[in-house]
C-alpha cells in the first residue's frame, strides 16, 4: 500500500530561513552608514570653515589722550635745536623705562638722549659724556637695551672742515639711562650710518652695523664700492670683534643698514641698493633739490646665523621707485622687524603707483621667497599725496604695527601728519589709519631746506605691547624757515585685538575643515557608486 500524504499541520512549520542575505542587499545596507558619515564630515567641514572666518568683534585702534613733545628744548622758544631721527627702545626688565636718542642738525651738529621711567608720560635728558681728545660734535646716535636691562648708546664724533665721521663710540648705562659711562672707541674715520642692535636672549651680545667709506667729498661719496659692515661685542660693548662685510659685492651702492636680531640669535640687516643712482650717491645734484633719480632701487635683506661671521642675501624687491632726491650721508632707512615665530617683515616707501606709498613685504618662517608687496596706507591709489618713512614694530602677541608720515589731508602734498595702522594676520590686512599728530607739520622745515632738500630725519620710532603702541616722530610745528626748529613728538594708541580665535586656531580650522570636506565628499561618492552598482 502506498503511504497516504495528508495536509501539513498549520502553525507549526518554521518560515523559510533568512540567515543568508544576498550580496546586493548587503551592499545597499552598507552604503547607508557610509553616506551618513560623508554628510556628517561635510557638515563639520562647513562649520569649521565658517567658525574660522568668524570674529565676535573687530579690532580697534584708538588714540589715547593727545600728542606731546619729548625733548626738553621743545618747550623753549629760545632753543631752536633741530631734533630728528629718533630711536625708541624699551627696557625688557623694567617696561616703564624707555629711552630715545635723537640727531641734532641745526644750529650746531649734536645729539641727545632722553629717558622716561613712567612709560613715556614724562622725559628727562641725560648728559652724553664727550670722548677725550675729540671735537665736541656728537652726532647720529643710536640706542639699544640689552636683555639684562643695560642701556647702550652709540654715536659718532665729527671732525675736519667737512664735518665727516672721525670715530664711533659706545657708552653704557646700568641705572636705567640716568647716567652714561665714559665712551669706548669702536671704529675709526668715515664710518657712516651707524646702527646698534642687541641680542634679545644673550645679555652681553651687541651688534653694530655701518657703511664704511673709502673717500668722500662734500655730502657725497666719491665712488661706489663702500660696503656695509658689522662688528660684534660679547661683553656688553667693552670690546669688539673684527669687522665682517655684510653687503655683497654686487651691491656697489648699498646704504642705510637697519639691523635686528631674532629670538633664535639670527642677525638680519635690511638695506637699500640704489643701483646706478649717481645723482644721490655721488652727489650729482650738488646738494640741490629737483626731480628724483629716474631708475629703480632695490631692498635687500642680509642674514647671518653665526653671529655675523658669514652672510646670505635675498632681494626683497628690485623695483622701488624713488620719491625724491636725498643726501647720501643722511638717507631714509627702511624698516625691518621679526616676530617670535621667525617671520620677517620689511617696509619702505615707493612711488610705483605715481606717488609715494608705504609697502610691506614678509618672509614666512622657513620660506625662501618674499611675499608680494602689500600696500599699507588706506588712501585712494594715485591720490597725489605721499605716505612714507614707515617704522615697523611687532607686539609680543604677534600684532604688526606700522607708523608713517602721511600727507593725505593736504591737497598740496606739503604738510605731514603721522598715521598708524595695525595688522592681526601677519600683514595680510590692516586696520584703518589712526592719526597720531594733532597738528600737521611743514615738511619744508629742516636742514637743507634752503637748497630744496629739507631733511626731517632718517627714521621714525615706535615700541609696541600687546595692548598699546607708542610712536615718535619729527615735528616742525614750532619751527619756521628762519629757525629750522624741529622737535620730537609722541602719541600713544590703545589696541584691542579682534575677539575670537587666534590666527593659529583659525588656520587649523581652515585647513582641517578643507581636509574633512574632501573626505566627506569622497565617502558620499563611494556610497553613490555602491547604490548605482545595485
Model features per residue range: what roles?
Residues 29-38, 43-534:
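Extracellular, repeat-based ectodomains that mediate carbohydrate processing or recognition
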